């Protein structure tokens, strides 16, 4: 006859319960490890003893924190899906979108904290490498943008310098204005030489004003007055 089915129920004796827990706990964690390795899945096992002691296991390629975060996101999405199954008319509504986006928001906040160098203890080596690559890419983009802005600023400054040099060259090359001749204060400031008579040889004779002559004699030129005096004599 085969062995009958063992009924699973709470062990009444406290000592027996503790002994049974100590014997079966390693087997539970071992089974969790085996299924994680054989099936390449994320497995997490959390056990608290009757005295409050914690025993846990997480797949070697991840951490307990990341598995719990994935669990929380899944629960949020499952909650939204359950609401839609019960109330299909809510699909696409703000309530459904809010429920569905809560997990994404939490994941983005976590990623942002990691980028700021916070809460890194829960990251694996692979996560750290991915985070480092993201930071390097961000720094390269920032440097490229900075260099572009500096080049644009230098171009503007060079253009202004060229304009100033051109203006300076034009000012230096422009001719200076000639000084205006002094104005004559009297009508006799310029006394012309007039050929108005002939000498004994018949050649024109140049007649000039006598020394000390002024225009005070009735405002007439000296040669007219001289002609008048000669006629009288």
UniProtKB/Swiss-Prot annotation:
Example of a GO cellular component annotation carried by this entry: nucleus
Coiled coil (UniProt feature): none
Compartments, record wording: Nucleus
Recorded superkingdom: Eukaryota
GO biological process per UniProt: positive regulation of transcription by RNA polymerase II; regulation of transcription by RNA polymerase II
Annotated MADS-box domain residues: 1-61
CDD domains (alphabetical): MADS_MEF2_like
Tissue: Expressed in developing seeds and seedling shoots.
UniProt cross-references to SMART domains, sorted A to Z: MADS (SM00432)
Domain K-box, chain residue ranges per copy: 91-184
Keywords from the named record: DNA-binding, Nucleus, Transcription, Transcription regulation
One Pfam family from the record: K-box
Record GO terms (molecular function): DNA-binding transcription factor activity, RNA polymerase II-specific; protein dimerization activity; RNA polymerase II cis-regulatory region sequence-specific DNA binding
Keyword Nucleus in record: yes
Function of the molecule: Probable transcription factor.
PANTHER family for this protein: SERUM RESPONSE FACTOR HOMOLOG (PTHR48019)
Protein's recorded name: MADS-box transcription factor 20
Lineage per the UniProt record: Eukaryota, Viridiplantae, Streptophyta, Embryophyta, Tracheophyta
Gene: MADS20
């Amino acid at each position: 006859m085969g062995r009958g089915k063992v009924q699973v129920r709470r062990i009444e004796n406290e000592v027996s319960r503790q002994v049974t827990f100590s014997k079966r706990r390693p087997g539970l964690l071992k089974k969790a490890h085996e299924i994680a390795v054989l099936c390449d899945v994320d497995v997490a096992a959390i056990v608290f003893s009757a005295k409050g002691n914690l025993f846990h296991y997480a797949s070697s390629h991840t951490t307990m924190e990341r598995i719990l975060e994935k669990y929380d996101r899944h629960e949020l999405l499952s909650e939204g899906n359950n609401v839609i199954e019960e109330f299909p008319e809510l699909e696409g509504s703000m309530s459904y979108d809010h429920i569905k986006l809560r997990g994404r928001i939490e994941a983005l906040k976590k990623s942002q904290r990691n980028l700021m160098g916070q809460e890194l203890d829960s990251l694996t080596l692979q996560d750290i490498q991915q985070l480092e690559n993201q930071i390097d890419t961000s720094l390269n983009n920032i440097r490229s943008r900075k260099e572009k802005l500096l080049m644009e600023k230098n171009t503007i400054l060079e253009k202004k310098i060229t304009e100033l040099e051109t203006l300076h060259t034009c000012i230096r090359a422009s001719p200076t204005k000639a000084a205006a001749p002094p104005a004559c204060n009297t009508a006799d400031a310029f006394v012309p030489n007039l050929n108005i008579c002939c000498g004994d040889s018949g050649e024109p004779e140049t007649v000039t004003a006598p020394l000390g002559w002024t225009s005070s004699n009735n405002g007439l030129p000296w040669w007219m007055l001289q002609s008048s005096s000669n006629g009288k004599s």
